[in-house]
């Protein structure tokens, strides 16, 4: 058993590509080793902005020898009319190093038994360049030199060591060897690695912390230490910490400051300038107030750190000057003037202006406000917020810091005298901004956010701008996922198709399937029964909250004893009704058996307020009241009676059963085997 080191040295990789790149390299290496039957214990990952590296631990000296059967020609073409071996069978056996008589007939085909010897690990690993590195894919590529090879960034060097032996291969003009490189500025020299096992200890000596998790821990410790020394509070934002970790090889944290006068600008603006634009960690005093300081991390040691501090402060000064200017100038603007100008701002060339988008959103929001049971005052706030909620797009601050759209809208709205509900809705209508992002907290904001997303999705689908594959340039999947989460949180019950049907366009079915796919995705993140999820999302109305609740309720009962017979009896009813060409009106006078009347009575008793019953109550009624009546009906009644009137009447009765149960789910899609 030996250890193998692979290091790919590169020009600086963009921070957001470092982690996915090293993960992909490890996955491809694992697949490559498995395909070549080369056993190993584990793969350890290392990454910095300039290198992607792996150590494969306890690698076998050679691949496993195996005996395998290779499928050959069909028996139908194995021999000619005289019973002689055909050319096809002779060619196959020759290719396998055998004779036709050595072949085995299994079923309709001939097979050759073949012994495959193990291959030395060195020979297998010499293919890593072509079979692992060259096959990597990236969202962003570069091409260099006079070749068509594409990679995330130009390759500068490759280390390939099996213990102390070089496993040589060429990739373009780079030959794998044992020489790595140190830090670009602190140790810009070749580093000879005598053994693969020296990598983790040798690189830090040359100012490269190759272990990404160790480097991240070091950054965290340094930041927390500086905060403690200065009696500050600091949050190690996960995404920011990940980004900073992927732009440095040898981190040194430092403290910077800015003029306290800028604290008159909203904290969100200052934080955006520091965190999002400059990758600084903002700090707070012990009262939780933003301090005129920041903590940043350089890619290097503490030498001449004072110059680094001054340089960073100078860059931040320019940004804060702009922010202060926009903050003062924007307050001179009137909301109504900005709203009027939105008529000349394009939402999308095929859809129209932002003003038109806002007008449609206002109509949708009014209907949602009724559904949500908002008070008259809240409905007034919904209408007002829908009239103005995009005005901040034309402010100087949002023009400079587009991350602050909505945030600045709230602040400027409050300064202009709008009430807190309207102002909050302006900020909240963008929520959630990510798959698990924060949801609106106010009712008015929830209605506006949902309405805005509904109109966006319907508008883009209406003009044929529909996401396909991974291509979703207008973030419609995120919009729908956010819409679903808002509806679920607010516990709104309404049929989404009512909004879609009132919208012009021919893509209604596609929209429903698109939304359904997002509901399915969210449910499958929490439930493991695909069939139950499918049943729930294929209920007879498009009530998203009902879909979600139904899936969880049904899943919660799947192990209960009555579950299987109940589902089977309802499914049988569904399948019989599906086969019927027409459904007649129920005529109780045509009932011939008591079980028909009993089932009819059960249906009638449940129909009252059925739609508004909680899903748990619905399912219990189906299992304990309706299903036993269905079972007794099937046990005592021949549905397909010779008398057509009686047959149609029984189908009609079952159709009422289906109408009831399908409000919750299509139970015929649930597997009970």
UniProtKB/Swiss-Prot annotation:
Reaction(s) catalysed (UniProt annotation): tRNA(Gly) + glycine + ATP = glycyl-tRNA(Gly) + AMP + diphosphate
SUPFAM superfamilies on file: HD-domain/PDEase-like
Principal location: cytoplasm
E.C. number(s) listed in UniProt: 6.1.1.14
Locations listed in the record: Cytoplasm
A Pfam family matched in the record: tRNA_synt_2f
A GO MF label: glycine-tRNA ligase activity
Similarity field: Belongs to the class-II aminoacyl-tRNA synthetase family.
HAMAP family: Gly_tRNA_synth_beta
Name the UniProt record assigns to this protein: Glycine--tRNA ligase beta subunit
